[in-house]
């Protein structure tokens, strides 16, 4: 990827939602916070107590929050308004946003590369992308397993331009060994990304296997899907991430491609396919982690979310949960 383009990969982080589990039913949420929480009551089984899973969006209280301190204040305010004082965090989402309307299209292939590396590294089976029904433009790429989810999506399209974010990269943790969000998103996720970066070659192989199947299926189709190898590669260029991968793909067709290296070089020169190095992917990872650290270390408190002000909404001050 060109350096002048990569430098525009800039993200702002924040907690999107937090899910907590509490005992008993949550059925008396005060009106001041009811738009911030969605509660699902689970009846007890075989003598077990009833429990409630509550999904909290702290940004709906006073607007988007860009520091962990103000996020905690908002979450505690919402919990107090819902009458929840004893709970366990069972899921949390962190968002990485850009307001740039071009950001999603500019970096969707780079983000796809990174997300694919996570899928390969952790052998994730639930991996998919979505497209607009009519334009066929990519809307999202996501992978999900028991422990985590990661998704990059066109936020402008999803919100119809109503959200300040135009592009969103989101990571979700669904299994917590410790109730420590900072550690989860700055340390646990760093280990996941580091592991993913070691599997880029396997990403190439996974895509090449799929592309080979698509090529043979296209040749066998009664309708013409492509007229040549060049046509095919242009159709699927978003699944080819580097010169090495393209050469290895072309080597699978010795009867059609006599000189894969020369073919790959000419294809790049003529059609300007976008390639990435491991350094490019690492740059994206470092920006994601930088944005996360900035969020957790920020001390600025948004106006209207100051300690004391929010508690005035309720008769009883919520207990502060130690991290």
Where in the sequence are the language-model features?
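Helix-turn-helix DNA-binding segment
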Residues: 248-251, 256-269, 274
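Structured, helix-rich domain cores that form ligand/interaction pockets
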Residues: 1-246, 252-253, 276, 280-323
């Amino acid at each position: 990827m060109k350096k002048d383009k990569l430098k525009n990969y800039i993200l702002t982080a924040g907690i999107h939602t937090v899910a907590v589990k509490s005992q008993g039913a949550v059925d008396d949420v005060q009106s001041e916070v009811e738009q911030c929480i969605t509660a699902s009551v689970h009846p007890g089984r075989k003598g077990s107590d009833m429990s409630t899973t509550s999904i909290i969006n702290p940004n709906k209280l006073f607007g988007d929050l860009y520091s962990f301190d103000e996020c905690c204040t908002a979450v505690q305010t919402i919990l107090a308004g819902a009458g929840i004082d004893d709970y366990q965090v069972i899921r949390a989402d962190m968002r990485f946003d850009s307001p740039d309307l071009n950001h999603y299209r500019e970096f969707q292939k780079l983000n796809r590369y990174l997300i694919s590396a996570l899928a390969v590294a952790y052998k994730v089976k639930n991996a998919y992308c979505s497209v607009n029904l009519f334009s066929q433009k990519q809307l999202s790429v996501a992978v999900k397993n028991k422990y985590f989810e990661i998704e990059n999506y066109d936020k402008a399209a999803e919100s119809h331009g109503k959200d300040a974010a135009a592009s969103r990269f989101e990571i979700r943790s669904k299994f917590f060994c410790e109730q420590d969000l900072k550690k989860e998103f700055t340390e646990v996720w760093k280990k996941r990304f580091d592991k993913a970066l070691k599997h880029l070659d396997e990403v190439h192989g996974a895509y090449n296997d799929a592309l080979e199947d698509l090529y043979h299926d296209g040749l066998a189709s009664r309708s013409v899907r492509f007229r040549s190898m060049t046509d095919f590669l242009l159709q699927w260029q978003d699944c080819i991430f580097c010169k090495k991968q393209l050469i290895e793909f072309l080597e699978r067709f010795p009867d059609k491609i006599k000189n894969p290296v020369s073919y790959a070089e000419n294809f790049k020169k003529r059609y300007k396919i976008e390639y990435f190095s491991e350094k490019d992917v690492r740059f994206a990872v470092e920006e994601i982690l930088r944005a996360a650290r900035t969020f957790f270390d920020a001390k600025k408190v948004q106006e209207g979310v100051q300690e004391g002000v929010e508690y005035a909404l309720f008769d009883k001050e919520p207990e502060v949960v130690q991290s």
